[in-house]
Amino acid sequence: MTNTRKTHPLXKIINHSFIDLPAPSNISAWWNFGSLLGLCLIIQILTGLFLAMHYTSDTMTAFSSVTHICRDVNYGWLIRYMHANGASMFFICLFLHVGRGMYYGSYIYFETWNIGVILLFAVMATAFMGYVLPWGQMSFWGATVITNLLSAIPYIGTTLVEWIWGGFSVDKATLTRFFAFHFILPFIIAALAMVHLLFLHETGSNNPSGLISDSDKIPFHPYYTIKDTLGVLLLILTLMALVLFSPDLLGDPDNYTPANPLSTPPHIKPEWYFLFAYAILRSIPNKLGGVLALVFSILILMLFPLLHLSKQRSMMFRPLSQCVFWILVADLFTLTWIGGQPVEHPFIIIGQLASILYFAIILLILPTVSMIENKLLKW
């Protein structure tokens, strides 16, 4: 008799995705982050759902409702900090997942890659709107500064900003709509993640060598289910250590002050995971130029399949490209550091140089080095 998991319409889909899926035999721990991102999304949706049961999206009561969650709701503090730090874990996994794709040439599957970039944008938008909800000082001023960037769009900019605000400043209407969008977007992200997997399973996974592995496949279960379980345990351990020992480590103290439109904080800065993009935005003295650089700093990922000039897919056997890749990683760390610093000498010039280097590496240096490697290998 045929196994139910291979015949039942629903069980069949799960079977082809997570059980009998043919997977390369040599994929490393860098391939764990897909499942970890799925776990992060589930954690965020569940904790977010319970927070939404007690949260009120009104300017008068939003801050108090978050305080109420932390003080009066059973384990409310735990749910709140799991949600806040869960976002940080989400972005750590995201950056490592994208970095893995860049290093091993996973972007050659361009449909999967482009949906991934759209997912990155969606997660960034969700995180930004979520940061506004507690209605602290940094929530309010972050929302004001970032939404105001749209006013740089010629002709329609100002109208667009007022349309997003639902008035002439960030106020009750803005908070309510941000809450609505923050609630719906994770479900859209979940749907997009399924499409991401659908396209991935059309081609099968890439592997560290970048070679076709059709002749050497193993079933996903039990080999990679057990491997993913280790990743899951490590992620939960890290998250809970952060939540239980140092929940405010990655937050901003300014957000414990209720929003006050009459008092601007000395340094307006976003959460740590946006600092690299914020540094690129600030490094250009022109408003529209800064906004374009900000958008393009993420959108540039979509160009990776077009900029791949190497005859080899992966960087595993390309030491020159590896060197450039790690310089890019160091550059992103530098940008993250600069994004959190005040706008003064020497941080301004460091930020500008780091921004130029970021775009130069991706658009110019990596493709050039790839061609040099082709020549060295007489390809």
Swiss-Prot record:
Heme b b562 binds at residues 83, 182. It is a multi-pass membrane protein. GO terms for cellular component: mitochondrial inner membrane; respiratory chain complex III. SUPFAM superfamilies: a domain/subunit of cytochrome bc1 complex (Ubiquinol-cytochrome c reductase), Transmembrane di-heme cytochromes. Its cofactor is heme b. CDD domains: cytochrome_b_C (cd00290), Cytochrome_b_N (cd00284). GO terms for biological process: mitochondrial electron transport, ubiquinol to cytochrome c. The cytochrome bc1 complex contains 11 subunits: 3 respiratory subunits (MT-CYB, CYC1 and UQCRFS1), 2 core proteins (UQCRC1 and UQCRC2) and 6 low-molecular weight proteins (UQCRH/QCR6, UQCRB/QCR7, UQCRQ/QCR8, UQCR10/QCR9, UQCR11/QCR10 and a cleavage product of UQCRFS1). This cytochrome bc1 complex then forms a dimer. This is Cytochrome b. It comes from Spermophilus alashanicus (Alashan ground squirrel). The gene is MT-CYB.
